[in-house]
């Protein structure tokens, strides 16, 4: 039988890292089993759902490389279908109209709270007579539709990640609301638990993979599946993503949306690679750098951990740096060039760009690191304290720079490649009895304003090509 999986996000915000990982796990299992992966947009909350969030979610999934089969389904287009199923539940006696007002519910909650009881509805209108219903309707009372949940009912299923899970009806908060309020004999707009069941059945979903925060929803939904005589899918509940303190990752942890990761300079391949290991581990593998295709070959839902997965920034940064190091230079240039363009920096040539990127990429964790790493090659570096001290405390330093400057001007050298740079340093060192180390440190201070930086010889070649090496040396001799 074909495996059919889905992601069902609500477009009430930007694509979250947790939603993206859920999408990834569904996508990986679909690929592993030659199944299908679908998108369903759960936009029945008209007030909070925004089309721009739908666009953001789909764009984010595309960016991560998570393609889907068929056009996404939108729940807002299927309201009448949900209402038909609610009507069916009413007809078979599995659901009923509840006229409890908001103020009555608030009063009930306060009593339960003061008594130290968990919040749950008291099902007070489950057995209303037809005359009582008519009386409420004549008063103009609005109603919701509630699904009957017997306190003694036991719900259990075999979860592919957690094994057998059991719930008692009494632990589900009372009879479940299926629809929003409506007047008269109308049925209000459907709510999450009803719509999900109807859609998963309609889409022939065979496997539901979602976060552990949905476990109680699964218990409720199983009862609706059975009442509507729908075939149950196989359920899997993934662990939550936790922050460094072991609490659920939230917006308070600064970065949670895929847009933010993208803007920070994470590569989609790296982020997807890292997300796969957030709660899942691969057996007998020496490498943690794996493409989605490679991961899909060995992925199994049963290998996902039950315990929460702590988000590790250092690990993500390391994985991202490996992808930067491995990326084809011309492709990496296209990405980094965007940052340079935003800074208003212009380079002498595409070839020069490639040389610079090759020089700095081993020091980059994120794409945006290219700004700081390449800044000295586009703008004059400020002289730092250690650079000033080196210039002022060693007589040989300024002498070294004078010799280099004179040589460049006397020989009328316009550009310098790596071999020429080494030749000049060797020649001046021998002819003037100056240690090569002093010469190279002096040049480094001239170029970068400090004693650290990328490879000096390759750097000199780049400074020479953009005609700034002489200017940088001269500023140290003023």
Swiss-Prot record:
GO terms for molecular function: ATP binding; glutamate-tRNA ligase activity; tRNA binding; zinc ion binding. Its EC number is 6.1.1.17. GO terms for cellular component: cytosol. Keywords: Aminoacyl-tRNA synthetase, ATP-binding, Cytoplasm, Ligase, Nucleotide-binding, Protein biosynthesis. PROSITE patterns: AA_TRNA_LIGASE_I. One of its GO terms (biological process) is glutamyl-tRNA aminoacylation. It comes from the Bacteria. ATP binds at residue 251. Monomer. It is an enzyme of class 6 (ligase). A motif ('HIGH' region) lies at residues 9-19. InterPro entries: aa-tRNA-synth_I_cd-bd (IPR045462), aa-tRNA-synth_I_codon-bd_sub2 (IPR020751), aa-tRNA-synth_I_CS (IPR001412), aa_tRNA-synth_I_cd-bd_sf (IPR008925), Glu-tRNA-ligase_bac/mito (IPR004527), Glu-tRNA-synth_I_codon-bd_sub1 (IPR020752), Glu/Gln-tRNA-synth (IPR000924), Glu/Gln-tRNA-synth_Ib_cat-dom (IPR020058). It comes from Prochlorococcus marinus (strain MIT 9515). It is found in: Cytoplasm. It catalyses: tRNA(Glu) + L-glutamate + ATP = L-glutamyl-tRNA(Glu) + AMP + diphosphate. It holds the Pfam family tRNA-synt_1c. Catalyzes the attachment of glutamate to tRNA(Glu) in a two-step reaction: glutamate is first activated by ATP to form Glu-AMP and then transferred to the acceptor end of tRNA(Glu). Belongs to the class-I aminoacyl-tRNA synthetase family. Glutamate--tRNA ligase type 1 subfamily. Its main location: cytoplasm. This is Glutamate--tRNA ligase. The gene is gltX. A motif ('KMSKS' region) lies at residues 248-252.
């Amino acid at each position: 039988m074909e495996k059919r999986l889905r992601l069902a996000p609500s477009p009430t915000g930007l694509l979250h890292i947790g939603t993206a990982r859920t999408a990834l796990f569904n996508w990986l299992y679909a690929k592993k089993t030659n199944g299908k992966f679908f998108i369903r947009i759960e936009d029945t909350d008209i007030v909070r759902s925004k089309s721009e969030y739908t666009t953001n979610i789909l764009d984010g999934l595309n960016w991560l490389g998570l393609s889907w089969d068929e056009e996404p389904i939108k729940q807002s287009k299927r309201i009448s279908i949900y209402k038909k199923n609610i009507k069916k539940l009413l007809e078979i006696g599995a659901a009923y109209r509840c006229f409890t007002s908001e103020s009555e519910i608030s009063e009930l909650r306060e009593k339960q709270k003061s008594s130290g009881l968990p919040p749950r509805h008291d099902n007070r209108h489950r057995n209303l007579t037809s005359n009582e219903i008519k009386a409420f309707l004549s008063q103009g009372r609005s109603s919701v539709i509630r699904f009957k949940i017997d306190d003694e009912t036991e719900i259990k299923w075999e979860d592919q990640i957690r094994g057998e899970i059991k719930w008692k009806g009494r632990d589900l908060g009372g009879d479940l609301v299926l629809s929003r309020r409506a007047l008269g004999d109308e049925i209000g707009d459907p709510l999450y638990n009803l719509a999900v069941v109807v859609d998963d059945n309609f889409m022939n979903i065979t496997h539901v993979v979602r976060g552990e925060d949905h476990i109680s929803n699964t218990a409720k939904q199983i009862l609706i599946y059975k009442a509507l005589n729908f075939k149950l899918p196989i359920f899997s509940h993934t662990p939550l993503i936790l922050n460094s303190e072991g609490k659920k990752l939230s917006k308070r942890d600064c970065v949670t949306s895929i847009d933010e990761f993208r803007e920070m300079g994470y590569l989609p391949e790296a982020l997807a690679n890292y997300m796969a290991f957030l709660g899942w581990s691969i057996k007998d593998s020496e490498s943690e750098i794996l493409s989605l295709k490679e991961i899909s070959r060995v992925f199994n839902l049963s290998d996902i951990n039950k315990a929460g997965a702590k988000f590790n920034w250092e690990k993500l940064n390391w994985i991202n740096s490996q992808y930067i190091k491995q990326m084809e230079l011309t492709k990496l240039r296209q990405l980094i060039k965007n940052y340079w363009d935003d800074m208003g920096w212009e380079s002498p040539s595409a070839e020069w760009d490639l040389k610079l990127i090759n020089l700095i990429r081993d020091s980059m964790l994120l794409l945006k690191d290219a700004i700081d790493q390449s800044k000295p090659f586009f703008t004059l570096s400020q002289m730092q304290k250690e650079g000033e001290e080196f210039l002022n405390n060693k007589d040989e330093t300024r002498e070294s720079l004078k010799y280099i400057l004179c040589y460049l001007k006397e020989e009328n050298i316009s550009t310098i490649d790596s071999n020429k740079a080494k030749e000049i340093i060797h020649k001046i060192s021998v002819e003037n009895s100056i240690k090569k180390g002093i010469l190279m440190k002096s040049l480094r201070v001239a170029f970068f304003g400090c004693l650290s930086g990328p490879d000096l010889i390759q750097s000199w070649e780049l400074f020479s090509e953009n005609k700034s090496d002489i200017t940088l040396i001269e500023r140290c001799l003023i």
